Design a protein with these regions (language model features):
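Surface-exposed, charge/polar-rich loops and edge strands
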Residues: 1-231
């Protein structure tokens, strides 16, 4: 066993692969992933998307961020990536496809097939995944996504870390083709135009601000927001 959490993570990953807990599919594939969840009003929604590889590009060249990042989390994720030589979780991206072409292609490919994974998590969300590996569907999805802009919904630190890792590996390799694994990253792609896509608020707690007056701040907020006191 390693002496720190990064080497221990690499040891665990290697053990899972050796024991067959994690296996590599024989054929190239993408993975259609749906999540069915219930809102507080009782309404049910199903978010649809797929997991696949995306080529790493600098921001503004087809992939766009919406938040700034911190150096600490990026350093942590880089150490994990260097130790494991793997993507440990998907970057969550949104794309626009009002015609739902990609979803229709994937739903056609899985019609009548049981999911490869069907599990309800601790939050009551029903997660289902189907492996899609027929060449016609894969080609259709790739073609449909070729001109799409991607917007990172979650994973800014991991994406920037992957860019840094790619650059380090390119410098180390000297010569590279651009098709090496380090030029790509695992992503979850979801259509922002699908009815299953909903946006919930994110609650942040801010503390230790100097000269902060809550009453004055709330009074200023009333000019731009509708405020509701909960506690």
């Amino acid at each position: 066993p390693g002496s720190d959490r990064y080497s221990r993570a690499a040891d665990d990953l290697g053990k899972w692969m050796n024991e067959g807990v994690l296996t590599q599919d024989e054929k190239p594939a993408i993975y259609y992933y749906t999540q069915t969840y219930t809102e507080k009003d009782g309404s049910k929604h199903t978010r649809k998307g797929f997991i696949g590889l995306s080529r790493l590009v600098d921001f503004g060249k087809g992939i766009h961020p919406h938040e700034r990042t911190l150096s600490g989390p990026k350093a942590d994720r880089l150490q994990l990536m260097q130790a494991c030589d793997a993507n440990m979780s998907c970057i969550f991206t949104l794309y626009s496809d009002p015609a739902l072409r990609v979803n229709k292609l994937l739903e056609g490919a899985i019609a009548g097939k049981a999911p490869d994974i069907d599990v309800t998590d601790d939050d009551g969300i029903v997660n289902k995944i189907w492996r899609v590996d027929d060449k016609q569907t894969l080609s259709g999805v790739i073609e449909s996504m070729s001109d799409k802009s991607l917007f990172i919904a979650d994973g800014h630190h991991r994406y920037e870390t992957a860019l840094n890792y790619r650059n380090m590996m390119r410098e180390k390799a000297g010569n590279f083709t651009g098709e090496e694994p380090f030029n790509f990253i695992m992503m979850y792609f979801s259509n922002m135009d699908d009815e299953g896509m909903t946006i919930w608020p994110t609650h942040r707690v801010v503390h230790s601000l100097k000269s902060f007056d809550a009453d004055s701040f709330l009074a200023s907020c009333k000019e731009y927001f509708d405020l509701k006191e909960f506690a």
